């Protein structure tokens, strides 16, 4: 009997696929049954080798060894993944396996994950590709009924390979180059660094901002209020107020406009991450993680998408889905919603995957068994679908201009004619615990041109507002639009990163200490600011990186040459190393941490500083050092804090509370004495119990 081997990206996906195709017998590292073997990767089972694997000299970071340009490229299997790789390799090479199905995630990265494993295993058997946008049983069955040759995705693989190689070349070489120059590990990345630069530029604008005071004059008559434009000085504003108080204001003009606001599009990953950050405070990574969990539970369609439309063959499916949601969701009770499904259907605007929507499986299960965060995300996606197929929001605006004492004042009002999709949106937002911006409607009284009023007047003081710090919501939007104004109209990819990678980029910036979260705000640290300032434009420009993304998209479509792209990347890396061969001595200390002075050295009188593991004398010729993990303090289960160290240096002794006694098993308070013998180690002793 021969088998078809199916390789998924992770165990949970393999389990779902196996259940649908009848591979129900659990084996070591795979499922078997119905003529199928179903195994899995654990993310990237195979990766590019580290630089040190090409040559031992690369284990140390030296300028003279740069640039590092692998030829040929080598691959490794990480130690923690070797067991599963060996299982997959043995399955690929089993004599009774006559064909292979690539069932990794349907996208650029998923293609790369499978191809690396397939090549590393030395397999040459024919491969078909499973391409699905949902983990529902019906979608998996349909996918297996429409498997395509994996060669159809060769261009996608070349795009993924170019992306991975470019990231390695720029990341390894630029990180080593600037780390060596500045004597500190400075992580540089193709997308990460321009993103940091955007944060630094915004921070600089905020710091440079100088608020300016201005004034407005308001006139009032009953419920009517109209305002002047901005007035620069208080004297002029008060003069206008005095003239208008008790005077007559005449309605000079009234302009009425009927307007229509179409529903917003369905969610792609970026818009879902932005809205979840705005409404729930989720980070981009949290939203992606929750969406991935819901996808694997078959409740949500594939989340790593950049499309906000559905394919035209999904019309009937969406009709049924909407009807079911209207019955299921509390916010939909009593809604009169004739669905306009055609608005969300456009096959031309769907590339790898359609927009994110709930599945029919979710309609059956509902919110039962979901965590609170998953419930929030599902509610958000459901309400978006209902909004997207609802009627437009129709309203009328009224702009009335008044003349009073030779000055012009304006009043604006808005009246809703047809609530449309906004009724659903407002119902959803009313269920949220978080504060949301509610639209305040200002209805003007009935007015006629030439109508006259006796008015009172007042002066209001205002200040101009600084630019706002980025939140994950606004930064994701800026990343998505980066470079768009400088690129051709028909450029398909105009941004930093992809929907699937942006969350990880933000997390890495935070982990590396270049960015910190302050509430919802993302703010660059001192090191982040310095790094963005010292790096060249070729690494920090969002426009150049957006051009890369567009080229990668063109490669995936077969419209650009991958070899040309890689040649340009290698040339850029060579030029970078050549240009930055040295820096001035004063700049070499730019990233050195400001040392905290603890006290004076009892041996030489120089300053003693706090290090990561010790308190050390700043005089290199002096050997005085107090180790934080000194056995004296560890035996007594007491942290050797800067406060204790400072007291010992100043007074030769420190009062310490909560010392542990091994003899009694209890704690006690005592005075610890510094007993410096002048040798390599410093001693301590307890003077007396108190």
Task: Label each PLM-derived region with a short phrase.
Residues 73, 95, 137-221, 256-260:
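C-terminal or mid-to-C-terminal helical accessory/interaction module adjacent to the motor/catalytic core
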Residues 225, 255-256, 326:
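Phosphate-rich ligand and nucleic-acid binding surfaces
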Residues 2-5, 92, 175, 208, ...:
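Basic, low-complexity terminal or inter-domain segments flanking catalytic cores
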Residues 11-18, 35-38, 42, 78-89, ...:
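Amphipathic alpha-helical transducer elements in NTP-driven molecular machines
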Residues 234-267, 273:
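Metal- or metallocofactor-binding catalytic centers and their adjacent structured scaffolds
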Residues 2-5, 103-106, 183-185, 256-265, ...:
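Conserved short loop/turn motifs at secondary-structure junctions
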Residues 1-164, 168, 466:
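Intrinsically disordered, low-complexity regulatory segments
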């Amino acid at each position: 009997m021969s088998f078809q081997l199916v390789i998924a990206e992770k165990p949970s996906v393999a389990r779902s696929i196996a259940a649908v195709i009848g591979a129900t017998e659990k084996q070591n590292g795979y499922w078997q049954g119905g003529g199928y073997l179903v195994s899995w990767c654990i993310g990237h089972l195979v990766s590019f080798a580290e630089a040190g694997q090409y040559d031992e000299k690369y284990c140390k970071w030296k300028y003279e060894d740069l640039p590092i340009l692998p030829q040929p490229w080598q691959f490794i299997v990480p130690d923690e993944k070797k067991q599963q790789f060996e299982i997959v390799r043995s399955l690929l090479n089993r004599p009774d396996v006559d064909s292979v199905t690539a069932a990794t995630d349907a996208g650029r990265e998923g293609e790369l994950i499978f191809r690396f494993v397939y090549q590393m295993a030395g397999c040459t058997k024919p491969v078909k590709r499973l391409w699905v946008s949902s983990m529902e049983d019906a979608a998996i069955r349909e996918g297996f009924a429409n498997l395509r040759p994996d060669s159809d995705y060769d261009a996608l693989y070349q795009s993924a390979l170019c992306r991975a190689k470019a990231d390695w070349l720029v990341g390894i070489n630029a990180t080593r180059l600037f780390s060596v120059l500045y004597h500190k590990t400075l992580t540089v990345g193709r997308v990460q660094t321009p993103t940091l630069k955007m944060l630094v530029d915004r921070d600089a604008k905020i710091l440079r901002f100088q608020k300016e005071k201005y004034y407005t004059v308001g006139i009032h008559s009953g419920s009517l209020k109209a305002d002047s434009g901005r007035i620069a000085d208080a004297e002029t504003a008060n003069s206008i107020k005095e003239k208008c108080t008790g005077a007559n204001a005449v309605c000079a003009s009234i302009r009425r406009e009927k307007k229509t606001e179409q529903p917003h599009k369905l969610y792609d990953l970026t818009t879902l991450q932005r809205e979840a950050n705005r409404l729930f405070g989720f980070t981009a990574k949290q939203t992606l993680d929750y969406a991935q969990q819901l996808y694997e539970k078959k409740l949500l369609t594939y989340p790593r998408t950049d499309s906000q439309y559905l394919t035209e063959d999904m019309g009937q499916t969406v009709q049924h889905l909407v009807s079911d949601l209207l019955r299921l969701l509390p916010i939909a009770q009593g809604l009169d919603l004739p669905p306009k499904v055609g608005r969300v259907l456009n096959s031309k605007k769907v590339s790898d995957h359609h927009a994110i929507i709930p599945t029919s499986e979710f309609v059956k299960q509902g919110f039962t068994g979901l965590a609170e965060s998953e419930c929030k995300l599902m509610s958000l996606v459901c309400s978006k679908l209902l909004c997207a197929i609802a009627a437009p929001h129709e309203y009328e605006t009224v702009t009335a201009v008044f003349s009073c004492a030779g000055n012009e004042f304006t009043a604006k009002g808005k009246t809703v004619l047809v609530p449309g999709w906004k009724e659903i949106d407002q119902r959803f937002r009313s269920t949220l615990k978080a504060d949301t911006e509610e639209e305040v409607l200002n209805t003007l009284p009935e007015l006629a041109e030439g109508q006259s009023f006796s008015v009172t007047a007042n002066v209001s003081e205002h200040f101009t507002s600084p630019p706002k710090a980025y939140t994950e919501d606004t930064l994701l939007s800026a990343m998505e639009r980066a470079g768009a104004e400088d690129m051709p109209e028909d450029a398909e990819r105009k941004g930093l990163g992809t929907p699937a990678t942006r969350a990880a980029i933000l997390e890495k910036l935070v982990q590396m200490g270049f960015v910190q979260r302050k509430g919802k705000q993302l703010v660059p640290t001192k090191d982040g600011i310095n790094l963005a300032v010292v790096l060249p434009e070729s690494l920090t420009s969002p426009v150049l990186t957006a051009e890369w993304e567009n080229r990668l998209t063109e490669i995936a479509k077969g419209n650009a040459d991958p070899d040309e792209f890689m040649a340009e990347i290698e040339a850029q890396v060579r030029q970078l190393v050549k240009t930055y061969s040295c820096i001035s001595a004063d700049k070499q200390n730019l990233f050195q941490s400001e040392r905290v002075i603890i006290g004076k050295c009892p041996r030489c009188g120089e300053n003693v500083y706090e290090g990561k593991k010790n308190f050390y004398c700043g005089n290199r010729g002096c050997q005085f050092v107090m180790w934080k993990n000194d056995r004296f303090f560890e035996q007594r289960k007491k942290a050797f804090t800067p406060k204790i160290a400072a007291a010992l240096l100043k007074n030769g002794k420190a009062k310490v509370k909560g010392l542990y006694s091994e003899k009694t098993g209890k704690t006690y308070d005592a005075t610890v004495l510094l007993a410096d013998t002048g040798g390599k180690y410093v001693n301590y002793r307890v003077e007396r119990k108190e």
